[in-house]
């Protein structure tokens, strides 16, 4: 209890003393964010200095890069040129199984179709598939 009374008495006197020294917060000029305009101006100036410093550094780096390019006869990459990638593939678009089957069934374009051997080829395919299925049951790799 005595500590509380002492704090109350000394606290009031301390705030009066600090108010007399100019440490009192009078709520002067503040912006919407609650910051002093001088602080904001200083931050903006500091940001501009930082950006200018980085611009200078990048210009120096570009001069160094250009010197290396000149020394070793390296061409600068064009920034505007973009390579056209189709879903990450370098080649053309991949054909679907339906498109491949349609190409296989185009008898007029193939040599077998022109010679009239389509029926014999189909019979050979059927026999080979049947033989493979029969043999596959005997070996462990087919299971």
From Swiss-Prot:
Keyword set includes Coiled coil: yes
* Places the protein is found: Cytoplasm, Cytosol
- A Pfam family matched by this chain, by name? Synaphin
**Compositional bias of kind Basic and acidic residues:** 23-33, 44-72
For this record, the Gene Ontology CC terms, alphabetical, are: axon; cytosol; SNARE complex; synapse; terminal bouton
Q: Which Gene Ontology terms describe the biological processes this protein takes part in?
A: modulation of chemical synaptic transmission; regulation of synaptic vesicle fusion to presynaptic active zone membrane; synaptic vesicle exocytosis
Q: Which GO terms describe its molecular function?
A: SNARE binding; syntaxin binding
Coiled-coil regions listed: 40-71
Q: Where is this region: Disordered?
A: 16-72
Q: Is Cytoplasm found in the keyword set?
A: yes
Q: Which UniProt keywords apply?
A: Coiled coil, Cytoplasm, Exocytosis, Neurotransmitter transport, Transport
**What Gene3D superfamilies would the database entry show?**
Single Helix bin
Q: What does this protein do?
A: Positively regulates a late step in synaptic vesicle exocytosis.
Q: Which family does it belong to?
A: Belongs to the complexin/synaphin family.
The entry's protein name is Putative complexin-1
Q: Which organism is it from?
A: Caenorhabditis elegans
Upper lineage: Eukaryota, Metazoa, Ecdysozoa, Nematoda, Chromadorea
């Amino acid at each position: 209890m005595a500590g509380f009374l002492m704090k109350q008495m000394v606290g009031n006197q301390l705030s009066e003393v600090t108010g007399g020294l100019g440490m009192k917060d009078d709520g002067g000029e503040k912006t919407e964010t609650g910051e002093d305009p001088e602080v904001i101006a200083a931050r903006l100036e500091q940001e501009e200095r930082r950006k200018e410093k980085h611009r200078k550094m990048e210009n120096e780096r570009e001069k160094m890069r250009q010197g290396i390019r000149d020394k070793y006869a390296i061409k600068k990459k064009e920034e505007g040129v973009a390579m056209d990638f189709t879903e990450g593939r370098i080649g053309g678009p991949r054909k679907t199984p339906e498109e491949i089957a349609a190409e296989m069934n185009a008898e007029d374009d193939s040599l077998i179709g022109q010679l009239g051997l389509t029926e014999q080829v189909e019979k050979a395919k059927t026999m080979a598939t049947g033989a493979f299925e029969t043999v596959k049951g005997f070996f462990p790799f087919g299971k």
